[in-house]
């Protein structure tokens, strides 16, 4: 619990200061790049202070000079804070719509072109999210998404939602699969406690959705790539 309180203190304190100063500055400059870099530094600092070490491999697999869709498995609330600073380009994120209502943070996320997703929403809401994500890609940003849609209950890779793959086919952006492990033992689903440990991120070879006939085939290729790169105890039972 102490590690969680330390993490929250760093994020709330430094995040509020950065937001109060950085949001008006970014608005005047019409560029959120500096605020994004500061935010990633704050996230990395919080993770380190919580006793979490992040090991990253496979960055050579990330296409240079192209907007990508980074797709990772999802096992813990810690995943975004571990993953985002490791991505070697400025990214937008598909996230729960409710997070956009958080004071200061919500404003910063809107300025950063983060994409709200309405869980269990109607078809129109889903299409609006895909459109916003496509616009972010076209503007030169990459996208981070957890295609399972929610955290795995047992740490094993679960089924994928089709929405992110519709986005990939629509934009033809390369998909970079990411195998994430370690965070499932640091913060279990339903728990507020954080245990120190090592989080491992493995960036896998990019997958071009254009080489597949439909999004179902693309989905299977990405899911198989992630499954095969995960430790055996995290692999899905259907692979």
Predicted regions and their residues:
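N-terminal nucleotide/polyanion-binding subdomain common to many enzyme families
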Residues: 38-46
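Short, basic, glycine/proline-bearing loop/turn elements
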Residues: 43, 114-119, 149-150
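Non-catalytic C-terminal accessory region of glycerolipid acyltransferases
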Residues: 5, 127-239
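Short gly/ser/thr-rich secondary-structure transition/capping motifs
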Residues: 50-57, 126-127, 183-185
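Short acidic-hydrophobic, aromatic-tinged amphipathic segments that line or gate anion-handling sites
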Residues: 56, 115-117, 209
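Membrane-interfacial terminal anchoring regions of lipid-handling membrane enzymes
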Residues: 1-33, 37, 60-63, 217-239
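Catalytic core of membrane glycerolipid acyltransferases/transacylases, capturing the structured
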Residues: 18-29, 33-36, 48-50, 64-122
């Amino acid at each position: 619990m102490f590690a969680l309180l330390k993490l929250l203190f760093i994020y709330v304190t430094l995040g509020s200061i950065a937001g109060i100063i950085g949001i008006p500055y970014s608005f005047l400059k019409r560029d959120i790049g500096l605020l994004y870099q500061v935010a990633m530094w704050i996230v990395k600092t919080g993770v380190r202070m919580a006793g979490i070490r992040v090991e990253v491999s496979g960055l050579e697999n990330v296409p240079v000079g192209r907007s990508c869709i980074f797709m990772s498995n999802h096992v813990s609330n810690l995943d975004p804070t571990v993953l985002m600073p490791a991505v070697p380009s400025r990214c937008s994120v598909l996230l729960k719509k409710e997070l956009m209502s958080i004071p200061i943070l919500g404003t910063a996320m809107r300025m950063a072109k983060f994409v709200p997703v309405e869980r269990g929403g109607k078809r129109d809401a889903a299409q609006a999210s895909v459109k916003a994500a496509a616009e972010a890609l076209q503007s030169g940003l990459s996208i981070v998404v957890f295609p399972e849609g929610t955290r795995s209950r047992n740490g094993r890779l679960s089924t994928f939602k089709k929405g992110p793959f519709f986005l990939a086919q629509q934009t033809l952006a390369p998909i970079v699969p990411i195998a994430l492990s370690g965070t499932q033992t640091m913060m279990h689903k339903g728990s507020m406690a954080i245990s120190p440990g090592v989080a491992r991120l493995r960036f896998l070879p990019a997958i071009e959705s254009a080489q597949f006939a439909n999004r179902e085939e693309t989905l299977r290729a990405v899911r198989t790539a992630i499954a095969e790169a995960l430790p055996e105890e995290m692999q899905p039972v259907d692979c």
